[in-house]
Amino acid sequence: MFAIMTVTGQDHTGIIAAVSTALAELDVNIHNVSQTIMDKWFTMILHVGFDDAALTIADIQERMTSVEKEQGLVIRIQSEALFSAVNDI
């Protein structure tokens, strides 16, 4: 399954490392990533893939909650199909 993840928050060292480490621990593969810093704000969009027989989007979001708290971020994930449907409207 594929999903789109967004990460936003005040820029600081270690954001990409924290997010990618948590995803790797879940065996979630990052297929594509785009990130930018606007003034002091960090923004990143990731296209990720994972085995939906072993893991759900809710499982990933739950794991990312600790990264959000530790890093002071807002992290959201949704299925690629839902993301595409909403953005096609």
Curated annotation (Swiss-Prot):
InterPro entries: ACT-like_dom_sf, ACT_dom, UPF0237/GcvR_regulator, UPF0237_ACT. SUPFAM superfamilies: ACT-like. Residues 4-78 form the ACT domain. Disulfide bonds: none annotated. PROSITE patterns: ACT. PANTHER family: UPF0237 PROTEIN MJ1558. Belongs to the UPF0237 family. This is UPF0237 protein CE1668. The lineage of its organism: Bacteria, Bacillati, Actinomycetota, Actinomycetes, Mycobacteriales.
